[in-house]
């Protein structure tokens, strides 16, 4: 049996779900409201996704929610589901 070797284009996959590239292959983000942002970042050999909310017109964080952590495919799939859920409940 031969090993399958494939490379993931992290930036392209993140763009497909609506994330903006902060630092290529390291951090991505998406604003979901005037006061909330979703982040995806590669930290300590693992991908982590979370949402932060802020006090309007300040940098002071009011809440933090861990969405998921794990390999890139898992995190992107969960972020896609989370963003779909948020968009569905906004409208």
Question: Residue locations for each model-derived region?
Answer:
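Short intrinsically disordered terminal tails
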Residues: 1-3, 84-91
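Negatively charged, low-complexity tracts enriched in Asp/Glu with abundant Ser/Thr
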Residues: 1-34, 58-61
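Non-membrane alpha-helical secondary structure
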Residues: 6-9, 67-71
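Short, flexible coil/linker elements and helix-boundary hinge sites characteristic
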Residues: 16-18, 22, 45, 87-90
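Hydrophobic beta-strand residues in large extracellular and virion-surface proteins
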Residues: 19, 29, 38-40, 47-50, ...
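Short aromatic-glycine-(Arg/Gly/Cys) micro-motifs in beta-strand/loop hairpins
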Residues: 34-64
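A short, charged, amphipathic alpha-helix used as a generic interaction element across diverse proteins
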Residues: 59-61, 68-87
């Amino acid at each position: 049996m031969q090993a399958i070797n494939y490379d993931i284009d992290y930036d392209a996959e993140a763009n497909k779900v609506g994330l903006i590239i902060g630092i290529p292959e390291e951090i991505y983000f998406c604003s979901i409201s005037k006061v909330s942002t979703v982040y995806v970042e590669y930290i300590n050999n693992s991908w982590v996704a979370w949402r932060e909310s802020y006090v309007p017109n300040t940098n002071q964080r009011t809440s933090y929610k861990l969405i998921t952590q794990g390999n890139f495919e898992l995190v992107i799939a969960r972020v896609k589901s989370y963003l779909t859920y948020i968009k569905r409940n906004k409208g």
